[in-house]
């Protein structure tokens, strides 16, 4: 399971280095095989171990090709999806269309989200953190059925 936010850099070839703490689990459990696609709700990328992505594909397969919203969702997620593999130095080559979608330049944030990573432009990550804090502080969490009993 992936957690924590790591500041990383993109090199001139559009590669990122996966932080060392994730490399061995990704290699041993997933053979370094990953799938990267776009997030449909934010300008970031989603990076899944290949077996986790298979679960997403199974869900996408159940969506209708005749219902416009479902078809659009499939088109976005599958149209941008790329199978990628970590090289011997723990690096991933990000396809140019994905770098463009997420507006990635040199500084980025790799954020663990249990079964996947989010990859953000560093400035956009900081802005969305502030936005998320504002939303959480303005909400009545007790009114949200799923969060009513959530405590830390």
From Swiss-Prot:
Belongs to the MraZ family. It is found in: Cytoplasm, Nucleoid. The gene is mraZ. Forms oligomers. Residues 5-52, 81-124 form the SpoVT-AbrB domain. Coiled coil: none annotated. GO terms for cellular component: cytoplasm; nucleoid. GO terms for molecular function: DNA-binding transcription factor activity; transcription cis-regulatory region binding. It comes from the Bacteria. Its main location: cytoplasm. It holds the Pfam family MraZ. This is Transcriptional regulator MraZ. It comes from Shewanella amazonensis (strain ATCC BAA-1098 / SB2B). NCBIfam families: division/cell wall cluster transcriptional repressor MraZ (TIGR00242). Keywords: Cytoplasm, DNA-binding, Repeat, Transcription, Transcription regulation. One of its GO terms (biological process) is negative regulation of DNA-templated transcription initiation. InterPro entries: MraZ, MraZ_C, MraZ_dom, MraZ_N, MraZ_sf, SpoVT-AbrB_dom, SpoVT-AbrB_sf. Signal peptide: none annotated. HAMAP family: MraZ.
